[in-house]
């Protein structure tokens, strides 16, 4: 995850 973006848990 990056800051606020989590495409794949």
UniProtKB/Swiss-Prot annotation:
Gene Ontology molecular function, alphabetical: neurohypophyseal hormone activity
PROSITE patterns per the UniProt record, alphabetical: NEUROHYPOPHYS_HORM
Compartments, record wording: Secreted
This protein's GO CC annotations: extracellular region
Disulfide bonds: 1-6
Biological role: Displays oxytocic activity on rat uterus.
Family named by the database record: Belongs to the vasopressin/oxytocin family.
The protein's name in its UniProt record: Phasvatocin
Organism this protein belongs to: Scyliorhinus canicula
């Amino acid at each position: 995850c990056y800051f606020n973006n989590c495409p794949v848990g």
